[in-house]
Amino acid sequence: MKNQINRKFIYFICCVSAMGGLLFGYDWVVIGGAKPFYETFFGIEADPAMQGLAMSIAIAGCLVGAMVAGFFADLFGRKPLLLFSAIVFLLSAYMTGAVDTFVPFLIARLIGGVAIGVASGMSPMYIAEVSPPATR
């Protein structure tokens, strides 16, 4: 019975951790749906360069987050780093919706991208760490 409970718990942990990989797609779907509205709100509907920057700055953040994730995981641990990246992503999502000028919007998107990059890099590592060797 105990083995079954542990197995279910491991599956639960793996499913929750795998959601870190979903953040990238989630971010693109949400920002894509909001695109017509924030372009009008920030007055960038006639500026393709700014439109592209608003969409792609999160990818730059992902790159940074993925590059530093290993260093910080060694420093703080994978689980605390995953929790921290989730909190940072939530805060960046709030900031993205709460700001009223374009530059803070870009900063919030960049910070969210860093959190996505960290979570994307740490999720598979954490899943491998908590999984029993027989089921890896």
Residue ranges and their predicted role:
Residues 1-136:
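Transmembrane-helix signature of 12-pass secondary carriers
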